[in-house]
Structure formats: structure tokens, C-alpha cells
Amino acid sequence: MSNIYIQEPPTNGKVLLKTTAGDIDIELWSKEAPKACRNFIQLCLEAYYDNTIFHRVVPGFIVQGGDPTGTGSGGESIYGAPFKDEFHSRLRFNRRGLVAMANAGSHDNGSQFFFTLGRADELNNKHTIFGKVTGDTVYNMLRLSEVDIDDEERPHNPHKIKSCEVLFNPFDDIIPREIKRPKKEKPEEEVKKLKPKGTKNFSLLSFGEEAEEEEEEVNRVSQSMKGKSKSSHDLLKDDPHLSSVPVVESEKGDAAGDLDDGGEGESAEHDEYIDGDEKNLMRERIAKKLKKDTSANVKSTGEGEVEKKSVNRSEELRKEARQLKRELLAAKQKKVENAAKPAEKRSEEEEATPDGAVAEYRREKQKYEALRKQQSKKGTSREDQTLALLNQFKSKLTQAIAETPENDIPETEVEDDEGWMSHVLQFEDKSRKVKDASMQDSDTFEIYDPRNPVNKRRREESKKLMREKKERR
């Protein structure tokens, strides 16, 4: 791979494509393909490729884009016509990450370009290579091909170029053109005029008269309240749950305060003027307060009944809990009484049992339980006790071996607890009865040393014999 990079000529120019798959750095061969590089850089400066999609994806082969129409048949060069191919002997389709011009034939280059996803020797001398993808951005380029495609090699959710940035421009004389892009036409749904509202035919309904009256009332209220904020006070005038007292004090009260400050004569006239209105308002307030008090009393009585029911329920639950506690305590007491029975009664019951095996089992069990209780559970005392048992076993073993001499060991197997201590382990002798007379020992090996003088004399004698035989012949 390093050999390939050495063969390629140095680059002169750099462009950054910002795509939905990530940024892609492209270095350009502006000396080897000047027309293609100038075309590509100027289109990037003119934002020609912005928001264009990669309309063709062939997995393992190429990813093609650069068509503003997104169909694969659009796009034009900066020269106003297709420009010629530019081939170079050191630029080959021998790896991934190369950028080349797409065309429909020879000398038919426009604005479309493609990235190679692998080796493509069949494209040599057919498409102009003008750049390469550099750095880790090659992995973003490979992500462009990770889409689902249809039978015509078109992706279902294509990636697109968000914007282009020219990092190094080798052509100082490029002047971007002002391209007038056609405005996008509005969709047909927005162009369509709104349909006129249909009239309601209430005669078709069984309750048509009532519905028609309600509709007229709603229309009348909506027309009267048009352009104003509406609340429940505006629509529900006869609702007893709504208060007639305004949240914000009326301006009359403020005016009354101002008149009081003005003088006594004016205040007296004002009091006489508003006396009748205030009385009416007070009467209405008192009547409504009485209604609220009665409704509050009804609610309080209902809440009191609910509280009584909840109290009764809680008392019942407490009683049940107390009863359960008593039952648990009684069960515990019975267990303690059963465990505290005298040992004499248990021994009498055991003696009364006719089965001797069961009685023996119980005696053994009691014996080992007593021994277990005597043992300490943990600590240094438990360790000392274990070492004492080990020493006791060792002394018992040595005593059994010393008491039984080798000649007095019986051949029969001993099944008692101490018989195995004096037993001697003996293996069967599998030696051969007939031995080779020439072999001193079966475990010895013959070692031949050529430096041994005996072996030297033997070799000389054998050589003499061989010479004599040859002379006789």
C-alpha cells in the first residue's frame, strides 16, 4: 500500500465536504487534472453542491453524487459544456478513496463525481481522477455506502452534502458566478383554494329543532363576543356555582375614595347617590353566602360520615392485628413447653418402643449430640482440641504397630476398628522366574565407547581381516 502512495504525484489543493455522514477531506491533483479541479473548486465556491444527494450507491464499487436534480442525468460544468477527459499514467483506480468525474461517455464531464469504495481497474482511462480522500475522513466516506438501495442502485434514505468549504485554492483567478436558482413551487395542496363551508340541514335529525336553536344561540354569542376574551361568566350567566363578585374591584370604589378626599359635601352627595346600589349588592352577597353555607354544611355532613366509616374500619383492622399477635404468642409458648419436657418421660417413651434398632440409633444420636455440645465452636480452644485429637490418634496408631509383631499379623482381613492399624501393605512380586544367563542384570545397559582401548584393538583386528580377504581374492 505504501508503494501505491509513493507512485501517486503530490497534491495541490484541498476541499472539505460537510455531509450527513460526516466531514470528508479531499486533496486535489490540480497539476495533473487542471480542468476537473478548477470545475470542482468553482462549483464548491458557488455552493452548487449544497443540499445535493448521493443518488447512486454500488456497494463495494462507487458512491456517486453532484447532481442538483438528484436524478443522475442533471448538472453542468462551469464551462457551459462538457469538458475533455484528463488521464495520467500515475493516477490509477487501484484503491478506495479516489475522487473522479462521472460521465456517460468519453469527454462528457459535467458536475457529477464519485468516490471509489475499492479497486476498480475497469475504470482506468475512462474517468478522470482529480482527487483523493485523506485521513480518518475515509471512514465517513465509507458510511455513505451503508444505506438500503433498490434495484436501480438508488438509496432509499440517501446521504447529502450539507455544505462545501475550499481550504486551499490553487487557482487565484477563479471568480464565483451568481447563479439564479429557480424558486421551488408550492405543492398543489397549498395552492388549492379552501372549500366553502357546507350548510347544516337540521331537518334530517330527529332533534333538529333543538339543535337549530342551539346553533343560532352559539352564533349570536360568538358574533357579540368577537374580538374579546371569553370566560365562563360570559356564557354561563345562570350558573349558581359562579360568583357575581368581580375579582378586580370596580372603578366606582376608587372614585368614591377620591370624592371623600375632595370634601364633606361632595361625599354626602355621593353616599346618597350610591346608597341604593350598595344595598342591592349587599343583599345579593348575603343571599349567596347563605347558599354557600348550606352547601358547605351538606358537604361537611357527608365528609363526617366518610370519616366515621374510615375510623370504624381502622378499629376493625387493629382488632384483627391484636388477635393475630395473641395467636402467635400462644403457638410460641406451646413450642417452648414441648421442648422443656423432662428427659425421664422421653427415656420411658423410648424404652416402651419395641424396635431395638431404633433405640440403638437414638442412643448413638444422644451420644454424639453430647460430644458436639462439649466441643467449642470457634477460637483457640477449638484449635487446641483438634490438635489434641490428632496427637491421640497418632499415639494410638504407634501403639497398635508396636503391640503386633510382623510374624503374628493374620492373613485374614480384620473388620474391627483397630485391626487395620496393624495391617501391612504388601504388593505382588511380578518378577520373571527364568533369567537370561548372559545378562548380568535386567536393568543394566550396554555402553559402547569408541575411545576404549579394547574397542580400538577390535577395530584394528577387523581391518586386518578385511585386508587379508582382499589379498586372497
From Swiss-Prot:
CDD domains: CWC27_CTD, cyclophilin_CeCYP16-like. PROSITE patterns: CSA_PPIASE_1, CSA_PPIASE_2. Residues 177-386, 399-473 are annotated as: Disordered. The modification N-acetylserine is found at S2. GO terms for biological process: protein folding. Keywords: Acetylation, Coiled coil, Nucleus, Phosphoprotein. GO terms for molecular function: peptidyl-prolyl cis-trans isomerase activity. Residues 257-266, 405-419 have a biased composition (Acidic residues). Residues 177-193, 231-241, 267-287, 305-348, 360-372, 426-438, 458-473 have a biased composition (Basic and acidic residues). Residues 206-230, 305-378 form a coiled coil. The keyword rRNA processing does not apply. GO terms for cellular component: catalytic step 2 spliceosome; U2-type precatalytic spliceosome. The modification Phosphoserine is found at S347. It is found in: Nucleus. Residues 11-166 form the PPIase cyclophilin-type domain. Its main location: nucleus. As part of the spliceosome, plays a role in pre-mRNA splicing. Probable inactive PPIase with no peptidyl-prolyl cis-trans isomerase activity. As a component of the minor spliceosome, involved in the splicing of U12-type introns in pre-mRNAs. Part of the activated spliceosome B/catalytic step 1 spliceosome, one of the forms of the spliceosome which has a well-formed active site but still cannot catalyze the branching reaction and is composed at least of 52 proteins, the U2, U5 and U6 snRNAs and the pre-mRNA. Recruited during early steps of activated spliceosome B maturation, it is probably one of the first proteins released from this complex as he matures to the spliceosome C complex. Component of the minor spliceosome, which splices U12-type introns. Belongs to the cyclophilin-type PPIase family. This is Spliceosome-associated protein CWC27 homolog. It comes from Pongo abelii. The gene is CWC27.
